[in-house]
Amino acid sequence: MEAEKQSDIKGTIAFDTHGNVIESTGVGSQRIEDIGDLSKVTLDAEGFAQVQGDSLLVHLYKRNDITLAVYTSAQ
């Protein structure tokens, strides 16, 4: 993904309400097991949330039945 090369995005995962992966990139491809935990995160009224991981931040956005997780550096 070209945007990843020009930003601090380390990877992404897009998944549906059943935990099926729609697309993954970068470290997201190696963190598919995160889907179970990420799908339980409480989102705000607009469908956003942020989760601090070990060395990564995970930015979540859900619209309809699709959730997008964007992994960035936790710096």
UniProtKB/Swiss-Prot annotation:
Transmembrane segments: none annotated. InterPro entries: YNR034W-A/EGO2 (IPR021591), YNR034W-A/EGO2_sf (IPR035098). GO terms for cellular component: fungal-type vacuole membrane; Ragulator complex. GO terms for biological process: microautophagy; positive regulation of TOR signaling; protein localization to vacuole; TORC1 signaling. Gene3D superfamilies: YNR034W-A-like. Disruption phenotype: Sensitive to high hydrostatic pressure (mechanical stress). Pfam families: YNR034W-A-like. This is Protein EGO2. The lineage of its organism: Eukaryota, Fungi, Dikarya, Ascomycota, Saccharomycotina.
